[in-house]
């Protein structure tokens, strides 16, 4: 078993322990104190695990984070704090015996720490404050950090990620069951947007398509069914001794009787039709009348879906809750000598039967509540004249009955209700009868259309209730996104130390390359590929769709990141125009000497983004033009990409060392694009060797600024004489 597998096993066991620990918060403290020795023993184990693993996992996340290690950091810290809090609360309860104070302390009811104000500082000192209070806020902040990833210093980025992890520790706690107040189910995340991009938009805007969509990524919905029907399991676990105590056996028997389902009677005409159709299969010779019967039976079943039988009523819900509560009290009397008073029991008397419909019950599965709410809605709809009209015998039922009659008694004359074209043509035209028939058909059409719309609304609300009422656990998307962002900042931080050489190029070298490139033009056919390179360099670590197994173009990755970060449309237009590029260097060669990735004097985030786009454009197009002019194959790579850095221009996004280049003597950092290109050109010249006779010295003349002087300009009237070599 390798280290990762061992960590997964440890995480799984910690999750089991965390769930038990979370349940203890809601239990009667008297029951917890009755087994205090076991609580202390498990608490010591948790403290030992925290002291053994926490610091190591924290350091691991600052070197190479993963979703698992980030989650482990959150889980260990939360369990450690929860054990200390429970221990202190139990010590206080032994003194004052006040359950209300105990639960207020354990559940932190008098204070809310699930809010955080983060001060974000960009490269040039531009600061702004972001308020976080839900998982949606955290996910949105991570998306925005992804959008301005290049403008954040790595130390600042890691510090922000550390604060987010601390907030997740408070918000998630020791248990991964999500608190209802910690997320908004109607607010979507980047994964929701990614899923929508896989289907055609049919001309609808992104906001319209996201409207009404429920996010199942930040919190994942877990369906629980038939919790109330587990009475057989409970009966087996209780044992014979407990079942014979008091009224426990009779209560168990009553619970069994509540949810006995009665099979709803199927429509008689459909049942008869199915019995007839069972005689035929794919090898039988099927008469036309049987085919018609099969088709009408199908449509009849479809139409009957509007009548929905709900297998639970409000009375059954309340009866189930009351009986389970009585069973719990009787078992508590047998085991502990008194009725348990847990957190839920303290507020039990404050709820009416109708209010329990919205609050729910720990003894009834959420799916039952959802069925009940939906059933009450449909029952209210049944009282309307529209539904009553639909419940009447329709033409499909009449057709089925007619066909069955023909099959059973083929000698009988045709049923008057069947369609007979010849008779219709011969019959006298009855205008009044036709009007009534058309009117009935119109009412039927309107009724079905209206009902379908009402049912669609009910289904939509049912989805919302299902998300709200059902158990939700924290998804792994937050931890995955956080680990990707952290790894990007970690790789950038590695090249901030002083061990990297500083370039020794001067302004002359900068000007030499720039003057060589300025008169040239970039080949027009290179622009589309260069645009993709620029999008790749600008895209944050989260928008990595261009690196997936089925990669998308880099501009699509950039579009996803911008859209979810809620970048304004005019900014996206400015980005697109900047990336389009041009073949004329005079347009994009705007960076001064040693001023690459310098944002001094810029006080606005939007202006910083535009300046960053211009920097990346100049870098990309300058390297491409340099390759074209000098016949080189230089490539630009990001520091957070898994590629060979040797011989490539490395973009770090760091203000102090935005560019790196590996030469024979090691890695060198640059603040100027053209000095880096000169360094590459000089390295090529030094690698060129010529066979020289022994005893004869040979050296390659270093390019000089005066090489650009024309022959007719070599006089002191234009070029100062001090620049000429003596």
UniProtKB/Swiss-Prot annotation:
A zinc finger (C3H1-type) spans 189-217. InterPro entries: UL28/UL56 (IPR000501). One of its GO terms (cellular component) is host cell nucleus. It is found in: Host nucleus. ATP binds at residues 626-633. Pfam families: PRTP. One of its GO terms (biological process) is viral DNA genome packaging. Associates with TRM2 and TRM3 to form the tripartite terminase complex. Interacts with portal protein. Component of the molecular motor that translocates viral genomic DNA in empty capsid during DNA packaging. Forms a tripartite terminase complex together with TRM2 and TRM3 in the host cytoplasm. Once the complex reaches the host nucleus, it interacts with the capsid portal vertex. This portal forms a ring in which genomic DNA is translocated into the capsid. TRM1 carries an endonuclease activity that plays an important role for the cleavage of concatemeric viral DNA into unit length genomes. Belongs to the herpesviridae TRM1 protein family. This is Tripartite terminase subunit 1. The lineage of its organism: Viruses, Duplodnaviria, Heunggongvirae, Peploviricota, Herviviricetes. The gene is TRM1.
């Amino acid at each position: 078993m390798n280290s990762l597998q061992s960590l997964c096993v440890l995480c799984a066991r910690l999750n089991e322990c965390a769930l038990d620990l979370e349940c203890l918060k809601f239990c009667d403290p008297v029951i917890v104190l009755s087994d205090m020795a076991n609580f202390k023993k498990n608490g010591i184990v948790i403290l030992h695990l925290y002291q053994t693993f926490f610091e190591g996992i924290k350091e691991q996340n600052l070197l190479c984070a993963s979703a698992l290690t980030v989650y482990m950091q959150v889980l260990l810290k939360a369990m450690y704090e929860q054990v200390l809090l429970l221990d202190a609360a139990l010590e206080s309860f032994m003194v004052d015996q006040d359950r209300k104070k105990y639960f207020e302390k354990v559940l932190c009811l008098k204070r809310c720490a699930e809010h955080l104000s983060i001060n974000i500082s960009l490269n040039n000192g531009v600061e702004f404050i972001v308020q976080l209070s839900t998982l949606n806020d955290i996910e949105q902040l991570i998306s925005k950090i992804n959008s301005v990833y290049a403008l954040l210093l790595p130390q600042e980025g890691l510090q922000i990620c550390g604060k987010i992890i601390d907030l997740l520790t408070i918000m998630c706690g020791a248990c991964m069951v999500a608190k209802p107040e910690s997320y908004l189910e109607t607010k979507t995340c980047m994964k929701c947007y990614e899923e929508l991009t896989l289907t055609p938009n049919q001309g609808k805007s992104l906001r319209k398509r996201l409207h009404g969509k429920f996010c199942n990524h930040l919190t994942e919905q877990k369906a629980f069914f038939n919790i109330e029907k587990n009475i057989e399991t409970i009966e087996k676990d209780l044992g014979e001794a407990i079942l014979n105590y008091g009224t426990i056996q009779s209560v168990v028997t009553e619970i069994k009787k509540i949810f006995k389902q009665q099979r709803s009677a199927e429509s008689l005409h459909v049942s008869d039709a199915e019995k007839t159709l069972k005689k035929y299969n794919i090898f039988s010779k099927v008469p036309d009348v049987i085919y018609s019967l099969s088709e009408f039976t199908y449509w009849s079943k479809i139409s009957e879906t509007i009548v929905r039988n709900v297998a639970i009523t409000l009375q059954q819900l309340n009866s189930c809750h009351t009986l389970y509560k009585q069973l719990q009290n009787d078992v508590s009397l047998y085991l502990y000598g008194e009725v348990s008073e847990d957190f839920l029991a303290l507020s039990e008397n404050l709820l009416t039967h109708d209010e329990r419909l919205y609050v729910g019950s720990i003894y009834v599965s959420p799916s039952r509540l959802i069925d009940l709410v939906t059933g009450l809605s449909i029952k209210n709809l049944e009282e309307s004249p529209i539904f009553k009209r639909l419940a009447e015998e329709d033409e499909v039922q009449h057709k089925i009955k007619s066909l069955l009659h023909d099959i059973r008694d083929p000698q009988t004359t045709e049923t008057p209700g069947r369609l007979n074209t010849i008779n219709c043509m011969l019959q006298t035209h009855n205008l009044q009868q036709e009007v009534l028939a058309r009117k009935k058909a119109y009412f039927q059409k309107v009724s079905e259309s209206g009902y379908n719309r009402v049912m669609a609304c009910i289904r939509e609300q049912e989805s919302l209730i299902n998300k709200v009422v059902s158990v939700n656990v924290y998804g792994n998307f937050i931890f995955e996104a956080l680990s990707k962002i952290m790894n990007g900042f970690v790789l950038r931080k590695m090249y901030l130390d002083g061990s990297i050489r500083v370039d020794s190029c001067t302004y002359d070298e900068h000007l030499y390359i720039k003057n060589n490139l300025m008169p040239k033009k970039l080949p027009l056919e290179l622009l589309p590929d260069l645009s993709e390179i620029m999008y790749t360099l600008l895209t944050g670590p989260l928008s990595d769709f261009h690196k997936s197994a089925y990669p998308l173009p880099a501009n699509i990755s950039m579009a996803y990141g911008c859209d979810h970060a809620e970048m304004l449309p005019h900014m996206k237009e400015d980005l697109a125009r900047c990336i389009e590029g041009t073949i004329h260097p005079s347009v994009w060669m705007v960076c001064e000497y040693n001023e690459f990735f310098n944002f001094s004097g810029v006080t606005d985030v939007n202006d910083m983004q535009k300046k960053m786009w211009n920097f990346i454009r100049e870098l990309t197009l300058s390297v491409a033009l340099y390759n074209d002019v000098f016949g080189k194959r230089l490539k630009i790579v990001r520091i957070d990409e898994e590629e060979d850095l040797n011989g490539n221009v490395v973009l770090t996004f760091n203000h102090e060392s935005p560019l790196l280049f590996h030469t024979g003597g090691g890695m060198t950092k640059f603040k100027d694009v053209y000095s880096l290109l000169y360094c590459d050109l000089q390295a090529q010249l030094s690698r060129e060797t010529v066979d020289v006779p022994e005893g004869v010295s040979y050296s390659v003349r270093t390019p000089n600024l005066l090489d650009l002087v024309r022959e007719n300009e070599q006089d002191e009237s234009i070029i100062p004489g001090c620049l000429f070599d003596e």
